[in-house]
């Protein structure tokens, strides 16, 4: 219990402390820029980083538990195949379990839409789950993915700015040979080391995350694609078709389209932490993370694979009944 509390609060306290500490040190130690310029830049960058950090946590990834029609009435009936998922799952979900049945979570007792996964750390299912991030002690998914990408970008820019300023300040200190008359500012040196580490780490992770966004792929899907391709190859063998060229079904055909569906199409949506998804008055479940736009050709192949698996399961479950007649 105590360890759980520490694991929940410590990352948040540490993350905020590092941003505020480095910001305060740069406030008081940097004098190579006009003070007002330095203050405005530091406040702007650190504020964006802190705001998106807490927005990621407050908004959350989104969970299928919020939709009552996805609730399973009886796990036993689902396991016995006497309870079926709602039509929205049957009509829109592409991925099924290896035995051909629709995906569900026994822990949450919920039908799982495509891209939904259960987090063992949070003990909860999340929509379009990307990963569980220990720095937030929460999951990144459908609703907060945009803010997570922005947080990484803001933090990268902030880290690079702090690195540039502290490097220039330290260079000026050595160049003026102040080491002959005074000690090196330990706080400034610590902030420089932290900014080096943070700049490298956040830049690498930001690049990787944006790359996944342009592919319309989550971190989990990146690792699961091998299993999915294996299942499609089995289906391809059954119909004498080569499935080696099948793409990610959620790839919208261009990197810009994939990027815009997460980050928004306008510069304001891209640069500012504002919501980009509008409700569809004709479909209350659109843009809710329950289902996603797909490539028509790839979708057809996936659906044929699902239908084949469903027919095989139906045939196998009917055989014992026929044999007992």
From Swiss-Prot:
Record's keyword terms, sorted: Acyltransferase, Lipoprotein, Membrane, Palmitate, Transferase, Transmembrane, Transmembrane helix, Vacuole
Gene of this entry: PFA3
Residue intervals on the Lumenal side: 27-35, 168-185
Family under the similarity heading: Belongs to the DHHC palmitoyltransferase family. PFA3 subfamily.
Pfam families cross-referenced by the UniProt entry: DHHC
Function: Palmitoyltransferase specific for VAC8. Palmitoylates VAC8 at one or more of its N-terminal cysteine residues, which is required for its proper membrane localization.
Catalyzed reactions per annotation: L-cysteinyl-[protein] + hexadecanoyl-CoA = S-hexadecanoyl-L-cysteinyl-[protein] + CoA
Residues annotated as domain DHHC: 103-153
Organism lineage: Eukaryota, Fungi, Dikarya, Ascomycota, Saccharomycotina
Protein name: Palmitoyltransferase PFA3
PTM note: Autopalmitoylated.
Subcellular location: Vacuole membrane
InterPro entries found in the cross-reference section: Palmitoyltrfase_DHHC, PFA4/ZDH16/20/ERF2-like
Record note on domains: The DHHC domain is required for palmitoyltransferase activity.
Keyword Nucleotide-binding annotated: no
Transmembrane segments: 6-26, 36-56, 147-167, 186-206
EC number in record: 2.3.1.225
Organism: Kluyveromyces lactis (strain ATCC 8585 / CBS 2359 / DSM 70799 / NBRC 1267 / NRRL Y-1140 / WM37) (Yeast)
Membrane topology of this protein: Multi-pass membrane protein
Recorded GO CC terms: vacuolar membrane
Positions in the Cytoplasmic compartment: 1-5, 57-146, 207-325
